[in-house]
């Protein structure tokens, strides 16, 4: 049985049992659609069996590449955008301590990121920073022509060639790309870069359990075996457990779709642990790209409490009643702090003396759950015993499966993203890319230029 638990105690006032049961029936039908591969986008269901079907040999090859990176590099620059980097970053930042010592810095490779936006200042400073550092690059792109990572990789490759010489960089660049085709694959073959394969049947936002996510995670010093073990446990549970028997993914999908039908059109991912910052970013891409189409979809947002209680808390409590929350709870911190008594008690906090800081955080969480429920915001709770590779593997696979089920319940293809092309086509036209001349004329005319 998985470590993950779900409670709907603060949802029940909004979603009656008969409505929930109907949604659970729909969720079970969607689960069967995922498992039998009969739904829209079924050519991208390779992620479903990844944890159980990934070979030990494949994990070993990834670990060997990670060890090579660790042997000669202080930094690994992960070049990718969207699902090509968010899964890895979610796991790495969830597991990396906020404050490192000189000793821990020597033991691990620091992960940097590029190609996830087009800001000139960021990339200029990154290149300047790397001038006198030992570094490697993991470039991740199925095609090799996605604009943001392609630009970043061109800049980094130029620096690598100047710094080490073209003939000496074949063990400093690792390409995660298509098995046999595409610009990046051809470039990797030309330079003899080591390559890892992005499976044809796995889309970017579902790729964290492929080399896309696993190589950076391993290079950062974390156990990809434990991550996959957690995912494998969740895979087994979600595939073998029917909705009526307590399938966690069906329960989550049923609740969010039931609330959506009642006008709750925005779901807020809430965490009380700053380390979940990029888990929430990964979650937003997963659900936003999977469900936001055909005029449908729950809008995914995120907040970090208690910090955002002092910014977004007012809106959540008293604003438009279109919100639902999913709160990620962690039962046990890795370390804790005890509050002590002070003689003069001039800050009025002696009533907390002897309590752990985690107790204060848990009380803030419970108090907020009650307040938001009373204010008209249904709150679902997802609980993990702790933050480690295994529990993160469970959580991420749970969300992937839930997203597929929820998308099918919504009646959309959870595995395409046609709307993403619109901005690209306009950008290409404005930049003068060949073949976009007519669109450029249309854009300039629309803007009032002749």
Swiss-Prot record:
Short name of any one Pfam family annotated for the protein: PGI
Residue positions of the active site: 289 (proton donor), 310, 424
A GO term, aspect molecular function: carbohydrate derivative binding
Chief location category: cytoplasm
EC number: 5.3.1.9
Transmembrane stretches, start-end: none
GO BP field: gluconeogenesis; glucose 6-phosphate metabolic process; glycolytic process
NCBIfam families reported in the protein's UniProt record: PRK14097.1
Name used for this protein in its record: Glucose-6-phosphate isomerase
Organism: Leptospira biflexa serovar Patoc (strain Patoc 1 / ATCC 23582 / Paris)
